[in-house]
Amino acid sequence: MQRSGTAFAASFYLKLQRIKPFMLVKPSFKKRLLLTTLLSLSATQIFASNNSEQIPIGKLPEWVIPESYDLDFKIDPAQKGYTGKTTIHLKLAQATDHIWIHGKSLTVKDVNITSAEGIKTKAKYEQASEIDGVSKIKFAKTLPAGQYQLVLDFNAAYDQQLDGIYKIEFEGKPYVMTQMEAISARQSFPSFDEPRFKTPFNIRLTIPSKYSGFANTQQTSEQIEKSGWKTLNFAQTKPLPTYLLALAVGPWQLQKGPDIGATSWRKQPIQLRGIAPDAKAEKMQHALSETPAILKTLEDYFAFGYPFDKLDLLAAPDFAAGAMENPGLITFRDYLMLLDKDSPVFFVQNSFNVNAHELAHQWFGDVVTMPWWDDLWLNESFATWMQSKITQKLHPEFNADLERITDTADAMKSDSLVSVRRIRQPILSNADIQTAFDGITYQKGAAVLNMFENYLGEEKFKQGVRNYINKHQYGNATANDLISALAEQSGQGERFTRAMKSFLDQPGVPLINTALQQEGNKVFLNVKQ
């Protein structure tokens, strides 16, 4: 997400929009957070009392590795829920009679697992912790290590809090869309809902014939079914974490965007489209017209072409986050996309800034993803910092350079509180994940990046970032990986590493006070640290 073109917009947008769905739609968040923690502990203790193995309410065990998903959804926005079938191709690194998986508020009707040799084994799905969305799948027998195909048939209600797969009504018409970040994929389909598990997805949607359906990738086929249904198949995605999966079904209207031709970084042209509620898509022309220049600026900076097979911008009539960087299907609050000649300047500037922020995520977050939420700053700090550079280059009249200064000042104010956390804060629970989307991650993280870019010089910093992206493309990387890439360019090795880690791994900032003092015809500068 992103801030706007003014100091007020920056503060307003950051604090009220990019805190993701958690605090925006749940005003009693603190009370719920406490209740969630207590219930989670109780559920864990109850389950653990009857089982020798502790419920993994943080990270799942490492001996189960998902390798790809086939997702089949039957979605009718006019109904109260949907059905689905999840097929997970996975590897068991050790013999076991069970695995742990994420699932929440799902009714799982049938489960089986098939070995690479074609031997099918029945299994049972048990909800171990409803609050944390952790489930246990027990096999009818112990399975040896090897490759398997796990199949789960399920159904679920559309979410009512704008999380996961949710339904909205707009001008009397029903729409279904998604918001998976941070951990809402688990309430949408059985999955390994952690960012370290990046796999390709094959998505198929069966929907009423009168509606349109979209996903992260281009549609490859459409099959007309009986009784007014159709099935849409989509190209396999690049390796993605579950939190970046996106779908949309309903009476959406398409608006074609400007052509984005091939470049030296990318051999294929990009299909750019706007998606909006019925009869609204024409208002997306302005946002679409700005997109090619943003994309070119990013490609030139990273020396890495836009990595996905299409680019759809969707204007959501009801969306808890400000925007979401789903590759190929970026979702925005509708007011950020639906503009006309009478739109306030604030909206126009904010539209550009948020678009730039989300497009920057296509590299930082989507191509290279943090393995765990303690490195969320790699996503959000970089997108915030990169958006400022793009805005300053393409729209200097938006005064992004001044906004950067006010953002840094705001970050330092927050960073002076006794309760302040460090940028890289240990994440041990779901509650920790949800509270990581804050000004320390966005504003302070971006300020630290800006400081070290100035220290290294723009070219050295840029080359370090390029090396980082290329080395870890379509995989996971940590702060240490980024620091290593920058340290190599610095020529200072461990000295640079210690300096950058000191700003990431402890709260606060070094404070230097200066004062001028005159004595007769002499002036003294007093410096105190």
Language model: regions and residue ranges:
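Beta-strand-rich interaction surfaces with strong enrichment in secreted/lumenal proteins
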Residues: 71-74, 88, 125-126, 138-142, ...
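A surface-exposed beta-strand-loop module
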Residues: 105-170, 227
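N-terminal, polar/Ser/Thr-rich
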Residues: 47-83, 91, 118, 170-174, ...
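Extended, low-hydrophobicity, Ser/Thr/Pro/Gly-biased non-transmembrane segments
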Residues: 60, 89, 151-262, 286, ...
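Ligand-binding face of N-terminal immunoglobulin V-set domains in extracellular IgSF glycoproteins
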Residues: 83-104
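Hydrophobic alpha-helical and helix-loop surface patches within well-folded domains
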Residues: 108, 133, 234, 261-528
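Bacterial N-terminal signal peptides that target proteins for export
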Residues: 24-34
